[in-house]
């Protein structure tokens, strides 16, 4: 008998399993596909690998403006694919080693349940006391006319490409769609983005969004918003105004939906619209001893959110005091150029219930940014006026996804803008912009 069986080996599942084993629980992980889940195999990791290649090319082009003659004679995509695969294999091996080290049983196969909630994998019954569902999600394909006639890619299949397309059309304007546009264009691919909503990146700060849109324009990435798609042909997406966006590869990146096969077998209660598994504050489902986390329960569909939720689950069934993950404390990252990172309340949300101070400090006023030719972007902190509580923050710029954690750490420890302003930042660093921003909020700025 297992104390805990985890279904799914993504960032939510494998982290939870290891933590449970470390707490003395006999634990097993069941995985139908590849260890590491979507994040490791078809998401966060392979996309960052390609974005790194794109960044190297952009850096070489930038160097040419400042006296270094770097020629991009040829581009070996096969080597890029090889490197991406090596990174994935290294991380997969790392998870397997962690399972061995912590005595977590890893079972490959499809989990299924009978009417008595008995668990079977590969025809073998597996007994459990607690069950954690970390089954993840799959690409959502919208009902587009004749889309089934096109040989389209999803984010689950995009990284299987062995040759670069000449022209890539992406239906979708969210984080994944935009990141992949940034990854492909520097590699010589013509990229078209098609978004049916009023704008791309609608979940991002409005100023950050405009910064990224400006960069897309500079890169000559074709962006269509408020698009009305009439149909999809073999080699083109046809819009209602007659415009055709041609492609030799079509990617549909319109979000993901929860994998609900296992919850349905277990007859678990879903949310009001039937899209996600309903859970309580300890991530327990409608049935005792069965928990669910990550993409299956809604909220931010992010790897680190799933991991944090999984750790809360383990703490709960081990008898510890726990509390749900605060959605306002989850960092959100966009790996474009410049990067965008944020957490907490946005400007409009903050204004609804607080008297707020909103200021921003541009990287164009930062010495390291100027020396590094990385002056795009800014640091913005949204704070409450009376006690200077940090309500949210946005960083747009080089290394923004690393820098956001400085502000988040102060917020997590219940620090205020004053305490953030008191930090001695090394000079010259991009992080000094955080200190300048904090000091400007309390009217103590030197350079702002």
Segments predicted by a language model, with ranges:
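FAD-site-proximal beta/loop scaffold in flavoenzymes
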Residues: 148-164, 245-317
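Flexible, glycine-rich terminal cap/loop adjacent to redox cofactors
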Residues: 7-10, 21-33, 38, 45, ...
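Glycine-rich dinucleotide-binding loop and its adjacent helix/turn
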Residues: 44, 135-189, 194, 266-267, ...
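A Rossmann-like FAD-binding core segment of flavoenzymes
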Residues: 108, 112-120, 126, 187-281
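N-terminal Rossmann-like dinucleotide/flavin-binding domain of flavoprotein oxidoreductases
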Residues: 41-42, 46-125, 202-227, 234-235, ...
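Short hydrophobic core segments
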Residues: 5-7, 111, 126-136, 171, ...
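Rossmann-like dinucleotide-binding cores of NAD(P)H-dependent redox enzymes
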Residues: 81, 86-92, 159-160, 165-169, ...
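N-terminal Rossmann-like FAD-binding beta1-loop-alpha1 element of flavoenzymes
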Residues: 2-29, 177-186
């Amino acid at each position: 008998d297992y104390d805990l069986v985890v279904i799914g080996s993504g960032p939510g599942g494998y982290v939870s399993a290891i933590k449970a084993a470390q707490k003395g629980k006999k634990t097993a992980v069941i995985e139908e596909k590849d260890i590491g889940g979507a994040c490791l195999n078809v998401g966060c990791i392979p996309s960052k690998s390609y974005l790194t290649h794109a960044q190297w090319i952009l850096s070489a082009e930038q160097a040419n403006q400042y006296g270094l003659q770097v020629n991009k004679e040829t581009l070996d995509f096969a080597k890029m694919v090889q490197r991406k695969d090596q990174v994935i294999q290294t991380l997969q091996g790392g998870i397997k080693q962690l399972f061995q080290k912590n005595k977590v049983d890893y079972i490959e196969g499809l989990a299924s349940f009978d009417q008595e909630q008995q668990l079977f994998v590969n025809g073998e019954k597996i007994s459990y006391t607690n069950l954690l569902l970390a089954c993840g999600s799959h690409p959502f394909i919208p009902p587009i006319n004749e889309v089934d006639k096109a040989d389209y890619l999803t984010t689950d299949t995009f990284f299987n490409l062995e040759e670069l397309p000449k022209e890539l059309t992406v239906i979708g304007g969210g984080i994944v769609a935009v990141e992949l546009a940034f990854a492909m264009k520097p590699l010589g691919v013509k990229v078209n983005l098609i978004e049916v909503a009023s704008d791309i990146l609608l979940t991002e700060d409005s100023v950050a969004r405009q910064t990224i849109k400006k960069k897309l324009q500079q890169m000559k990435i074709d962006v269509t918003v408020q698009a009305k798609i009439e149909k999809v042909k073999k080699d083109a997406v046809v819009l209602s105004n007659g415009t055709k966006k041609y492609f030799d590869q079509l990617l549909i990146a319109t979000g993901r939906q929860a994998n609900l096969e296992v919850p349905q077998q277990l007859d678990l209660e879903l949310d009001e619209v039937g899209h996600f598994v309903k859970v309580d504050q300890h991530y327990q489902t409608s049935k005792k001893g069965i928990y669910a986390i990550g993409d299956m329960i809604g909220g931010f569909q992010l790897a680190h959110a799933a991991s944090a939720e999984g750790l809360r689950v383990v703490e709960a069934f081990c008898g510890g005091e726990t509390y749900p993950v605060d959605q306002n404390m989850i960092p959100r990252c966009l790996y474009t150029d410049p990067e965008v990172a944020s957490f907490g309340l946005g400007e409009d949300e903050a204004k609804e219930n607080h008297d707020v101070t909103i200021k921003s400090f541009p990287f164009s006023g930062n010495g390291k940014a100027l020396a590094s030719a990385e002056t795009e972007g800014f640091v913005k902190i949204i704070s409450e006026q009376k006690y200077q509580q940090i309500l949210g923050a946005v960083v747009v710029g080089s290394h923004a996804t690393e820098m956001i954690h400085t502000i988040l750490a102060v917020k997590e420890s219940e620090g205020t803008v004053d305490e953030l302003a008191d930090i001695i930042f090394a000079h010259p660093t991009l992080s000094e912009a955080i200190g300048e921003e904090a000091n400007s909020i309390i009217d103590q700025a030197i350079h702002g």
